């Protein structure tokens, strides 16, 4: 299946159903009071994280998602049915952003987590709501309020504990193959890896972590060179980055310049990402004598002004890879647990929160029984349901 990590969709919540104007009509009850029911609330749109999905490709072709409208009220004080909510399933790790306002709606980081993306409209009020001691036959009603409409940008960001950085052909895919069951394509030409790959490193029955391999970076990636920096976002959730450096690049380039180029591109993309814990890992030590490899590792580290510890491995032979994974596991376990923010269904603001209350409070009934075409009995006999009832609509969409 093609890997797609970005998509734009339009979500439309359902409008609220309108209230109705109706009067009780029964045998021996010639002058029944108002019994117009309220409408139903419109359905809302929710994003739901689903661990069975791993790409946003479906939303490249299915871009419009609309919840059900609330039903209108009926006579006999019958309330309209609420519109059904719509659930849009997305992969775990999806981030939703409003494209028009730039507002970050939230991250879906756990299976089953729900995020309200669009609030359904509020129901309209029937004329029974406007009955007062001085106005026994109100002809007012309100229509339902419109539901939210949003254009959302969905971004899938892989959930991994460890991220791999490096130039093309630095040995990232070979490393993830050697320490996990993942089998990304490996070849001796640049950009063999075109999409991110995940692997689970399992040290024992109780200790494991997830590692992410992304396509290699080259100098000028922030300006679009190579595959650009579009995949760096998949490292934003990682807790530690492993910067793999090829000691003997096939193109004869300088390892020091290559390493510095990666750091530069990382800082251009995101200073926050560049500030994450980063370990230097020198790969392909099997291509030279051990003393020569150690001297070269120290030379590169000194040229980068590296003050921390660094590691040397041979991914293809599995040399020192297990020891490195054990140290990574110990480091991850020493970090405090990240607080996962739960999405609140009520986070998304809705402009009609006090609409009904204000409508009823501001309503001024007209009981002067004059001829100014208001809500009193003006001789039009609007109780006969002749299709020409003159009633006042408080809210018009």
Curated annotation (Swiss-Prot):
Enzyme Commission designation: 3.6.5.-
Extent of Gly residues compositional bias: 33-43
Needed co-factor(s): Mg(2+)
PANTHER family, alphabetized: DEVELOPMENTALLY REGULATED GTP-BINDING PROTEIN-RELATED, MITOCHONDRIAL RIBOSOME-ASSOCIATED GTPASE 2
Listed name of the protein: GTPase Obg
Family matches, as PROSITE patterns: G_OBG, GTP1_OBG, OBG
Record-listed GTP binding positions: 166-173, 191-195, 213-216, 283-286, 314-316
Subunit details: Monomer.
Feature: compositional bias, Acidic residues: 361-389
Gene Ontology molecular function: any one: GTP binding
Entry keywords, A to Z: Cytoplasm, GTP-binding, Hydrolase, Magnesium, Metal-binding, Nucleotide-binding
């Amino acid at each position: 299946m093609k890997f797609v990590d970005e998509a734009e969709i339009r979500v439309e919540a359902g409008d609220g159903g309108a209230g109705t104007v109706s009067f009780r009509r029964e045998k021996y009850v010639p002058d029944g009071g108002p019994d117009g029911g309220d409408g139903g609330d419109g359905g809302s749109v929710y994003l739901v994280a689903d661990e069975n999905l791993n790409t946003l490709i479906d939303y490249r072709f299915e871009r419009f998602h609309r919840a059900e409208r609330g039903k209108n009220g009926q006579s006999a004080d019958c309330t309209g049915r609420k519109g059904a909510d719509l659930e849009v399933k997305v992969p775990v790790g999806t981030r939703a952003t409003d494209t028009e306002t730039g507002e970050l709606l939230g991250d879906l980081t756990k299976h089953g987590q729900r995020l309200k993306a669009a609030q359904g409209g509020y129901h309209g009020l029937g004329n029974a709501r406007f009955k007062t001691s001085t106005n026994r036959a109100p002809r007012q009603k309100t229509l339902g309020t419109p539901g939210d409409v949003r254009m959302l940008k969905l971004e899938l960001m892989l959930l991994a504990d460890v991220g791999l950085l490096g130039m093309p052909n630095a040995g990232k895919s070979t490393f993830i193959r050697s320490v996990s069951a993942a089998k990304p394509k490996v070849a001796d030409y640049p950009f063999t890896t075109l999409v991110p790959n995940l692997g689970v490193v399992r040290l024992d029955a109780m200790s494991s972590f997830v590692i992410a391999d992304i396509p290699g970076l080259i100098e000028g990636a922030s300006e679009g060179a190579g595959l650009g920096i579009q995949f760096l976002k998949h490292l934003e959730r990682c807790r530690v980055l492993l910067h793999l450096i090829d000691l003997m690049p096939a193109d004869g380039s300088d390892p020091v310049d290559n390493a510095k180029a990666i750091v530069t591109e990382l800082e251009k993309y995101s200073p926050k990402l560049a500030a994450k814990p980063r370990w230097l890992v020198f790969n392909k030590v099997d291509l030279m004598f051990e003393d020569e490899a150690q001297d070269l590792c120290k030379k590169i580290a000194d040229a980068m002004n590296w003050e921390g510890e660094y590691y040397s491995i041979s991914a293809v032979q599995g040399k020192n890879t297990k020891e490195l994974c054990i140290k990574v596991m110990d480091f991850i376990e020493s970090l405090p647990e990240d607080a996962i923010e739960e999405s609140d269904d009520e986070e998304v603001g809705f402009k009609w929160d006090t609409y009904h209350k204000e409508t009823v409070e501001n309503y001024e009934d007209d009981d002067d029984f004059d001829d100014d075409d208001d809500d009193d009995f003006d001789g039009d006999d609007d109780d006969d349901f002749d299709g020409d009832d003159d009633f006042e609509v408080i809210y018009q969409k």
